[in-house]
Design a protein with these regions (language model features):
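Enrichment for repetitive, rod-forming helical segments
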Residues: 9-11, 235
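Charged, amphipathic alpha-helical scaffolding segments
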Residues: 421-422, 431
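Bacterial Sec-dependent N-terminal signal peptides
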Residues: 2-5, 12-48
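Generic detector of short alpha-helix boundary/capping microenvironments
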Residues: 7-9, 345
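Beta-rich carbohydrate-recognition and catalytic domains
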Residues: 27, 46-344, 349-412, 426, ...
Length: 579
C-alpha cells in the first residue's frame, strides 16, 4: 500500500515565515522574511539511490519526501506509514532493537512503559561567567548550546561542547557568538583560552548568529571536513544557513554555500541509515488570514551532499513537514488560543537502530506577554522516534525533560535540545539541554544535564509474553537490556511459529537482575549462527520485569553494530558500536 499526502494550499490560507523573537541574544520583534522577487531555483532531482528500501526492510513511497498539507495537516502531527505497512521480514542486523513503538511486535501481553532521565543534582554544568557571555548591557547572559553540539570525540578522548554566548563586546548587531568548552567526564567543563580571539574560548564570531548545528561527522573520510557547522545567521528577514567545516572544531572555514531564505531556530541532522542530511526548518504558518496568530511548524529538505543541500535549503510551504500533534500539552496558566502549542524546534540523531527526535514544544505565551508579565516562554523537550528519518511516532506526550515551576531554578523556562545528545557513558545516556531563569527582568541561560539508563526510553513491562514479527539477522550472540525482578526466558521460533530445536523456553538459561547487556544462552549450547539469514521470530517470557531492547551480535562481547549517537568513552571512533 502506498501512502501519499497531497499538498494543497487553500485560497483562504495565508502563511508567513517568521522568526523566534527574543530567544536569541539580540531579542527584538518577530522577524519576517519578505517575499522574494526572483523565481525560485529549480529543485534538484532526487537521485534514485536516495529512495527505495532502507536496511530494516521499510520501503519508501515513490513520492519522497511524502507530501503533506500545510492546511489540513497543520495540527495532525505525524503517523508513520511503516507501522501499518510493515515489511514481511525486518532486518535487525543494525543496532539494538528498542521497543519504542510496535514495529517489532507481532503480539504481546506486556505493557509499554515510558521512562524519563533525571536531572543531574549539580546543574547547571555550564553557566555564563565571562564578559563575552553577557547579552547587551542590561545584565542578561547566555552560555548554552542553541542546538550547537555536545559530543564525545573518540579520537581525542574528550567531551566537547560548542555553545552560544551572549557576545559582549564581540557581538554583531546584538547577536550571539560561538564558544567552545571541553571535559574529561561530561560533567565538569573548562573554557580553554584559544587563539581565535586571544584570551577567550571564542571559535566563531562576526555574523549575527541564531541557532547552529555542530556535527562531528565520524563517517567523513576527508579529515578537513570532519567537523561541520550549519549556522543560521544574518538577522531578521535575512536568515540563512551558513555551512562551515573544520579539521579540529576550532578553526572554521566558510564553504561559501549559503542557503536560501530560512528562519531562525532552524537546524540540520544526518540520517546515516539513508546517508542523507536533513534541513529541519522552522516555519510559522498562518492558516487563516483572519487569525492573528501563527502555528509553529517545520519544513523538510534532504540531500546527500551537505554543501549542495545547504545551497538549496529553503523554508517554504511546498516543503511543509509537520506541526503540533493534536494532543500536545498546553501551558497550565496561559491557554488563550494564541497559537500554542507549537513545534519550536526538532533536533535528531541516529541511536542504535532508530532516529531519536527531540522536539522543543512551545506552550506559550507569546513574546509580548512574556515581557509584560515578566515570565519566560514555556518550551519543554519531548521525544519522538523514527525508522526512516522523516516519519515521527510520538505515543508519549509527556516531557522527556521538563521545566521547573520554581522561578529561581536554572530550567524555569524555554528548554532547548542540544545536538549530539545522547552521549553514551557506560550504561548511562547523557542528555544536555539549555534552560533559562530570570534575575529581575534579565534572562540567564545556562546548560544542564539529564541522565537516563542506556536504551531506557521505553520498556515492555510486567508479567507476560511478547512475540516479535519475522526478523533476519547476521550475528550469532543474543543479548537483552532488561531489569528482571522475576525471570526472563527467550525462545526462538521458525517463520511458522514452531520452536526451533535447541532454542526452547525450557532450554533457555534464566536471565535475572538488572543488566544493560545480558547474554542469553541455551543449555543446548547452540548459538544462532546456524540461523543467520533465515526468517525467525523471538518469543520472550517475562515475569515481573522491564525489557528495554534485544539484539543479535556477531561478537561474544555484544557490540550491536548500531549507531552511537554523540559517542562516548571506549566506543568506536566511527560512531558505530563495533570492535
Amino acid at each position: 500500500m502506498r501512502h501519499k499526502f497531497l499538498y494543497s494550499i487553500a485560497i483562504v490560507a495565508a502563511c508567513s515565515l517568521t522568526g523566534c523573537g527574543s530567544d536569541s541574544p539580540s531579542g527584538g520583534e518577530e522577524p519576517v522574511v519578505p517575499p522574494t522577487t526572483t523565481p525560485d531555483p529549480e529543485e534538484p532531482t532526487t537521485p534514485d539511490d536516495l529512495v527505495g528500501t532502507i536496511y530494516n526492510g521499510i520501503k519508501l513511497p515513490a513520492q519522497w519526501p511524502i507530501l503533506r498539507s500545510a492546511t489540513s495537516d497543520i495540527r495532525k502531527g505525524m503517523s508513520p506509514f511503516y507501522l501499518t505497512t510493515r515489511p514481511t521480514t525486518v532486518n535487525i542486523a543494525v543496532g539494538r532493537q528498542l521497543f519504542v513503538d510496535n514495529f517489532l511486535i507481532e503480539n504481546t501481553t506486556l505493557s509499554r512503559k515510558f521512562h524519563y532521565p533525571e536531572y543531574y543534582s549539580g546543574n547547571p554544568i555550564l553557566s555564563p561567567d565571562k564578559d563575552w557571555e553577557k547579552t547587551g548591557t542590561k545584565g542578561a547572559a547566555f552560555a548554552a548550546p542553541f542546538s550547537d553540539g555536545v559530543w564525545y570525540d573518540e579520537q581525542d578522548q574528550k567531551f566537547k561542547m560548542w555553545y552560544m554566548a551572549g557576545g559582549g563586546s564581540y557581538s554583531t548587531n546584538s547577536g550571539g557568538i560561538t564558544c567552545y568548552a571541553e571535559s574529561t567526564d561530561g560533567i565538569s567543563w573548562t573554557k580553554p583560552s584559544l587563539s581565535i580571539v586571544s584570551g577567550t574560548n571564542i571559535v566563531d564570531k562576526g555574523l549575527q548568529r541564531d541557532a547552529s548545528t555542530v556535527w562531528i561527522d565520524k563517517q567523513e573520510t576527508n579529515a578537513s571536513k570532519r567537523y561541520k557547522m550549519f549556522q543560521v545567521a544574518g538577522g531578521a528577514g535575512k536568515w540563512k544557513y551558513i555551512y562551515k567545516t573544520s579539521a579540529n572544531g576550532i578553526q572554521w572555514r566558510d564553504n561559501n554555500t549559503p542557503s536560501q531564505a530560512v528562519t531562525d531556530r532552524s537546524t540540520v541532522y544526518k540520517n546515516p541509515f539513508r546517508d542523507v542530511w536533513t534541513w529541519s526548518m522552522r516555519h510559522n504558518v498562518r492558516v487563516n488570514s483572519s487569525d492573528p496568530y501563527t502555528v509553529r511548524a517545520r519544513d523538510y529538505y534532504e540531500n546527500s551532499d551537505p554543501a549542495t543541500g545547504n545551497q538549496n535549503a529553503k523554508a517554504e510551504l511546498s516543503k511543509f513537514w509537520f506541526g503540533p500533534w493534536p494532543n500536545e500539552q498546553k501551558h497550565p496558566t496561559y491557554n488563550n488560543n494564541d497559537g500554542a502549542p507549537g513545534i519550536y524546534n526538532l533536533d535528531a540523531i541516529a541511536y542504535e537502530s532508530i532516529m531519536l527526535g527531540f522536539f522543543s514544544v512551545w506552550q506559550g505565551p507569546e513574546n509580548d506577554v512574556c515581557s509584560k508579565d515578566n515570565v519566560i516562554k514555556r518550551n519543554q523537550i519531548m521525544v519522538g522516534y523514527s525508522r526512516d528519518g522523516f516519519s515521527w511516532q510520538r505515543d508519549d506526550m509527556n516531557p522527556l525533560m521538563a521545566v521547573s515551576d520554581n522561578r529561581a531554578d536554572w530550567n524555569n523556562g524555554n528548554l532547548q535540545s542540544v545536538v549530539g545528545a545522547p552521549l553514551i557513558v557506560g550504561d548511562k545516556l547523557y542528555f544536555y539541554l539549555s534552560g533559562r531563569r530570570l534575575e529581575g527582568t534579565n534572562e540567564i541561560t545556562s546548560t544542564g544535564l539529564a541522565i537516563l539508563r542506556r536504551d531506557g526510553f521505553a520498556s515492555m513491562s510486567g508479567t507476560g509474553e511478547l512475540t516479535t514479527v519475522g526478523i533476519r539477522f547476521t550475528g550469532e550472540n543474543f543479548f537483552v537490556n532488561a531489569k528482571v525482578n522475576g525471570e526472563l526466558r527467550v525462545e526462538i521460533l521458525d517463520a511458522n511459529g514452531n520452536v526451533v530445536s535447541g532454542f526452547s523456553k525450557a532450554e533457555c538459561k534464566v536471565v535475572k537482575g538488572d543488566n544493560c547487556k545480558a547474554k542469553v544462552e541455551w543449555t543446548s549450547g547452540k548459538t544462532l549462527s546456524s540461523l543467520k539469514g533465515q526468517k525467525i521470530k523471538v518469543k520472550f517470557y517475562l515475569t515481573d520485569g522491564d525489557l528495554y531492547a534485544f539484539w543479535i551480535s556477531p561478537e561474544s562481547t555484544g557490540e550491536s553494530q548500531g549507531y552511537t549517537a554523540g559517542g562516548g568513552p571506549n566506543l568506536n571512533k566511527l560512531g558505530i558500536d563495533k570492535k
